[in-house]
């Protein structure tokens, strides 16, 4: 017979599911799609034994997937745009420019800073990674840089930009859930963001300065790009167009459609004989490089709607699992009893961050990792006198920035698919995401930068 899931039962279920996923992905090195589907199967068996109907199970899956319909469509458009940007010479032009401007010793910190600036301007980590990030990744490959290190710098910068931009969905969501004013929220995040940024920059500088540039390979790659693709200052037009759309607060889907249309026009201007059939194949299957250098071919052969299908499959599977966990109140049952025991700010902030990390692990969706802890712990923050700004900062530091570190998470799977580097490879080098929750906890324990709505009673 169906009944309320107890705290103990919910913890046991979550631990078992996490052990299965971690063993499969980390110990055996399996891609996460099949292990996630297996956990969905196990949870389905448990639900039937506990008296849940097939309708309950289907509703859980449906509700879980529904939160990702828009992101999935955005991923499809980004896949199309990547192939188009390479064909139009946009990404190759950025690479050639980067070869001339970026010093090898400062390459990694430069990547981190550039992606941070672009991320703040655009307000989207996904767009930053899939556009400028790909170009910078290509430059890194030509310099013989460690791909995982370059990916870590790109993602760290993109996460910083996504976190600090007033145009970012996750930033606006955290502010709204905690009921704090947006720009006050961004300002308050500096207490954890600036230390994380500075330490990340130093680490990238130290690690980047230890490598050696292969000048011959850089010159050869630059020459091949200029021989086989159009390198032009006109490549900046779609980038400027994207920035204009961002600052005019045009949503992601119309922004991507506008950019796709502009890039298609550029392609036909560059090559009037480019056929509709070739355009269709480019959008569907991505750009296929056919140069004399196999490493350049591997670097530029990417994009297309089909390149995102593996990511889409993983997202649907993960959010099906997350939807069932939510529908059966497993996640809620594990969180709710904690609230009444959290009376010190350090403990409350630490548990809030850990809750966000756990929801990222179990549900795989960054928005829910902000919403659920926000709803569960808001009353506890009010009770001990912490301001909404304290909660909104913690929701960002333990929620949205962590999703990029989860192999089966929406953001993590997207970054891995787009850059071609597994999550577990770039995870140790995504310093900004790793440090943000640490500095947030330090702030909570020490009281430095902690905002109060009323003075705590001693």
Question: Model-flagged regions — what are they?
Answer:
Residues 51-141, 292-378:
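Membrane-embedded alpha-helical segments and adjacent helix-loop junctions characteristic
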Residues 153-154, 159-162, 166-167, 197-213, ...:
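Transmembrane-helix bundle segments that line or gate the permeation/cavity pathway
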Residues 103-191, 355-397, 458:
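Hydrophobic transmembrane alpha-helices that form the pore/transport pathway of multi-pass ion
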Residues 1-3, 86-96, 113-117, 212-226, ...:
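Short juxtamembrane and helix-loop transition motifs at transmembrane-helix boundaries
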Residues 5, 11, 177-193, 197, ...:
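C-terminal transmembrane helix pair
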Residues 1-9, 98-103, 119-125, 222-231, ...:
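Short, amphipathic, aromatic/basic-enriched membrane-interface segments that mark the entry/exit
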